[in-house]
């Protein structure tokens, strides 16, 4: 019983949620016991209650965190491993696999995970950042592959520094990592080499018979009879840079024997002149097994097994030059039995006998054995070890770029945010899509036409079609019964416009109706600019000559001399032929370059797409290569070796090795980038294969959206400036300690603090739904500070979703800005009254369809569409206000029920008839038919109770007389230890 009680208590302790996550179709939670529960659309089926995720035995340890992407769960366990759980895999069992393992990364354990739309970030104990999943927006590896199924380390090879002083644009220069410090590689350690061999029937040594006389030379010495056997060895050698190997070898000998037949022995004797060794041809009449190990040792528990000899094992030290062969000596056990030796004078032979097996050893042709003095024999064994190793070749020093010391990771949608210990924010991914929409939110053309204008219109009454005509009969054949179509004569109208506030010489202007209607027609024909985050103008303006008008105060540069246009077809032709097919075109600053999928059109001149077009200006100056991406469609890519602002783009540098790409299509894949690099330079691009974006040939992609034509201008206020790039991280400096970062849909909400200063909130990015809390729908490209007086006290946490941002203050109040269904609709932070401060919200999971809240005490709340059962409320009805998700509360109630059963008397426990598996959807607000409380079966309001105004009913006692006929209606009470009525 005590074990059951302890198990029930442990269940109650382990059922507290500690982490939540959600995507568009499901919700998952991790409890303090490491269990993972999920609800929603799982495996193509709707589950409207939480179910425990059955993973597999490969997940060792306890799961401590979970993050969801659009179709997967990523699990972090306390061993530092990260697993991917593909719960929608098209098979009977979901696929669980490891995407990050400390064993493969030098024991560096994962300690934190954050997830975006389809990617995940992993932070380790050593401060390294890894990523897995989608890389479509280069949110993991600049210019890398489209997707990474296993984690890849995120390396910073280059940066683009954001300059917040340019209010209308991103501008930047290459920062600290432009000239990386490459450390020298000092190789003091040895390489490790392995030697291993398994040999059979090899010569291993000799049995030495001493005090034996041989004629000639009629000297007394030692006769050595060769011994053969089976041996295997393995060892590890340390090889230095000079090719010298030292180490140890472990050997195992299973068989020793003397062969039958001809043998090559030796005779050794000493005299005054020294030691002499003479080889002898010997013959053996029979094979003698000296030692035989048990090849298949029996189990220790097998009492009937025959005992066998253990192999001869040992370890010996060896050393030598790589490529040579060294000798390893074998240590013979002290009590090792050896054959006995006798001498037959009649036959001049010696007899070796072991275990009733004899062999006669005779010297052939080379001499005769003539005398023997009995003496102990010895056994000497050794074997040859070829040193199959090589002297290490000089290795080039591994290129290591200095990496920041990472302090925090954040992710959302297609953006990855890394924060270092200097509070610099590195942003990867789709933030390059944002641009200022300030001009798009201005008044329309019609408002500009009638701005400050007093208009009066005069017209004759007969021009109004106000007559009450009878219904027209279309079937009437008589033309007289048909009404004539009414036509208004505009020449009879008069329109008078006055400008009383105008500073013009003419305070009043008269405009004819035709002029007014023509202007009105122009407004109607103009492209509509509704409040949107997309630019209305299809032109891409490039300032190519004169003063570029850079808002950052950079010096003006010399005019542009020429611009070269590439596209995919011309690049493929260039790469295949190793020579460009160039077509030169004279242009000026009013030239418009248009293109489609078939051809260029430059000032009404058609040029084939496989041509490399060189636009020649009249003035000399820095050369700029412009590449137009036709298939995406649209893009401008160029290199620059001039000074700042020679072209109206904001990423700038002063070295000719930088290649700038301006693209207003989708992101180029690695193959396209490689071809582009080859087209721009036929040099070697990669000094080290570890880095995809080498620092000697940097290609910076600047992505914007636009139309299908480019216009070159001297100066134009509509110049599109954009410097956030997907190919390298953009670095933001706020000079404040970064506390928290909310990553929304192409926007950032950063919570910063400092010594003796209250926390502040800075925002940047897309704001089409007011999610930045600035009171407008203006998308901003420079940091703006929120008014902290809006909040009741300082903000401690921020959470961003698509089109909405939540703020949690120190008083546990929850504020929100943006738009989320009918729950939130405000461009400034407003307190959410339906979220009680007593809940002390500590975490939030925000999706388009639902919001999940986690309280500090482990309570979970949710709201949303719930059409797939994502909230786990046992139904699929819409939930419009934050509602407690009582699954884990009911799970604890079930554990309490088991706890009570464990303490109850066995007879009472057996008679409850409620030992059914836990099913949360059977329970009501008070627990169900088997739960305690006033609404339970034995409570006053339960089905067996008397009710609020009644006495005890006939069914109050749950145990019937038919079960206990001797006691009638009285319940069995052993020793009166069970109180039947008020048990609960």
UniProtKB/Swiss-Prot annotation:
Stretch list, region Disordered: 941-984
GO CC annotations, alphabetized: virion component
Major location category of this protein: virion
Subcellular location: Virion
Keywords, ordered alphabetically: Virion
UniProt xrefs under Gene3D superfamilies: Regulator of chromosome condensation 1/beta-lactamase-inhibitor protein II
PANTHER family found in the cross-reference section: REGULATOR OF CHROMOSOME CONDENSATION (PTHR45982:SF1)
Protein name according to UniProt: Uncharacterized protein R345
């Amino acid at each position: 019983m005590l074990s059951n009680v302890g198990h029930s208590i442990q269940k109650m302790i382990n059922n507290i949620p500690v982490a939540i996550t959600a995507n568009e179709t499901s919700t998952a939670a991790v409890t303090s016991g490491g269990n993972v529960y999920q609800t929603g659309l799982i495996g193509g089926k709707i589950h409207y209650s939480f179910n425990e995720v059955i993973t597999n035995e490969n997940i060792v340890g306890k799961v401590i965190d979970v993050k969801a992407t659009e179709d997967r769960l990523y699990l972090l366990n306390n061993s530092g491993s990260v697993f991917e759980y593909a719960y929608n895999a098209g098979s009977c069992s979901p696929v669980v696999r490891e995407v990050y393992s400390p064993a493969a990364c030098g024991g560096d354990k994962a300690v934190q995970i954050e997830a975006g739309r389809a990617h995940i970030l992993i932070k380790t104990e050593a401060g390294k950042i890894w990523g897995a999943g989608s890389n479509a927006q280069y949110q993991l590896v600049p210019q890398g592959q489209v997707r990474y199924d296993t984690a890849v380390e995120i390396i910073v090879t280059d940066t683009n520094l954001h300059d917040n002083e340019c209010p209308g644009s991103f501008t930047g220069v290459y920062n600290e990592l432009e000239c990386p410090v490459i450390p020298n590689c000092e190789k003091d350690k040895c390489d490790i080499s392995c030697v291993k061999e398994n040999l059979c029937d090899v010569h291993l040594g000799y049995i030495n018979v001493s005090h034996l006389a041989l004629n000639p030379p009629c000297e007394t010495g030692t006769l050595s009879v060769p011994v053969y056997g089976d041996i295997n060895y393995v060892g590890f050698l340390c090889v230095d840079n000079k090719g010298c190997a030292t180490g140890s070898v472990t050997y195992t000998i299973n068989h020793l024997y003397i062969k039958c037949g001809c043998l090559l022995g030796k005779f050794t004797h000493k005299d005054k002149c020294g030691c002499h060794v003479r080889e002898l041809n010997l013959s053996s009449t029979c094979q003698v097994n000296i030692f035989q190990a048990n090849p298949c040792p029996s189990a220790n528990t097998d009492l009937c097994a025959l005992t066998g000899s253990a192999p001869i094992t040992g370890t010996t030290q060896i050393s030598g030059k790589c490529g040579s062969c060294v000798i390893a000596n074998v240590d013979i056990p002290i009590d090792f039995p050896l054959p006995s030796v006798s001498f037959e004078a009649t036959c001049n032979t010696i007899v070796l006998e072991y275990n009733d097996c004899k062999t006669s050893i005779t010297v052939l042709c080379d001499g005769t054995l003539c005398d023997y003095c009995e003496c102990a024999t010895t056994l000497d064994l050794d074997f040859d070890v070829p040193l199959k190793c090589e002297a290490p070749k000089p290795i080039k020093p591994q290129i290591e770029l200095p990496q920041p010391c990472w302090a925090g990771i954040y992710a959302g949608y297609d953006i990855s945010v890394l924060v270092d210990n200097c509070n610099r924010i590195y942003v990867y991914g789709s933030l390059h899509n944002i641009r200022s929409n300030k001009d798009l939110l201005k008044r329309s053309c019609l408002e500009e036409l009638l701005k400050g204008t007093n208009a009066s219109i005069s017209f004759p009454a007969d021009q109004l079609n106000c007559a009450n005509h009878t219904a027209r009969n279309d079937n009437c054949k008589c033309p007289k019964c048909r009404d004539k179509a009414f036509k208004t004569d505009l020449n009879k109208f008069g329109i008078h416009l006055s400008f009383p506030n105008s500073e013009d010489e003419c305070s009043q202007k008269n405009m004819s109706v035709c002029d007014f209607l023509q202007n009105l027609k122009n407004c109607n024909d103009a492209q509509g600019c509704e409040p949107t985050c997309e630019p209305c103008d299809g032109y891409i303006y490039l300032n190519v000559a004169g003063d570029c008008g850079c808002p950052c105060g950079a010096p003006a540069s010399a005019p542009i001399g020429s611009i070269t246009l590439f596209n995919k077809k011309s690049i493929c032709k260039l790469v295949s032929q190793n020579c460009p097919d160039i077509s030169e075109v004279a242009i000026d600053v009013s030239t418009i370059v248009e293109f489609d999928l078939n051809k260029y059109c430059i000032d009404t001149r058609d040029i084939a797409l496989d041509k490399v077009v060189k636009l020649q200006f009249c003035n000399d100056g820095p050369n700029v290569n412009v590449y137009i991406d036709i298939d995406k469609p649209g893009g401008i890519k160029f290199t620059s070796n001039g000074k700042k602002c020679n072209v109206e783009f904001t990423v700038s540098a002063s070295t000719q090795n930088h290649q700038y790409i301006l693209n207003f299509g989708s992101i180029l894949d690695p193959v396209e980038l490689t071809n582009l690099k080859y087209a721009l330079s036929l040099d070697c691009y990669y000094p080290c294969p570890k880095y995809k974006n080498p620092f000697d040939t940097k290609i910076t992609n600047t992505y914007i959206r636009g139309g299908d034509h480019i216009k070159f201008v001297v100066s134009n206020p509509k110049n599109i400036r954009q410097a956030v790039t997907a190919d390298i991280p953009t670095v933001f400096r706020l000079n404040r300690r970064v506390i928290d970062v909310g990553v929304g849909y192409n926007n950032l909400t950063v919570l910063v603090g400092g010594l003796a200063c209250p926390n502040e909130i800075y925002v940047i990015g897309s704001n089409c739904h007011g999610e930045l809390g600035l009171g407008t729908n203006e998308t901003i490209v420079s940091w703006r500070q929120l008014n902290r007086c809006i909040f009741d006290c300082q903000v401690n946490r921020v959470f961003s979703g698509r089109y909405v941002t939540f703020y949690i203050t120190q008083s546990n109040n929850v504020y929100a800005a943006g738009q989320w269904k009918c729950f939130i609709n405000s461009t400034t932070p407003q307190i959410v009254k339906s979220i009680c401060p007593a809940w002390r919200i500590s975490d939030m999971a925000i999706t388009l369809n639902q919001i999940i809240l986690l309280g500090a005490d482990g309570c979970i709340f949710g709201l949303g569409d719930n059409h797939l059962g994502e909230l786990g409320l046992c139904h699929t009805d819409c939930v419009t206000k934050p509602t407690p998700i009582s699954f884990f509360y009911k799970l604890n109630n079930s554990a309490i029920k088991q706890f009570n059963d464990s303490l109850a008397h066995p007879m009472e426990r057996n008679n409850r008839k409620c030992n059914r598996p836990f099913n949360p959807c059977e329970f009501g607000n008070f627990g169900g038919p088997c739960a305690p409380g006033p609404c339970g079966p034995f409570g006053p309001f339960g089905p067996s109770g008397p009710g609020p105004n009644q006495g005890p009913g006939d069914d109050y006692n749950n145990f019937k007389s038919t079960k206990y006929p001797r006691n009638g209606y009285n319940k069995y009470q052993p020793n009166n230890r069970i109180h039947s009525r008020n048990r609960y």
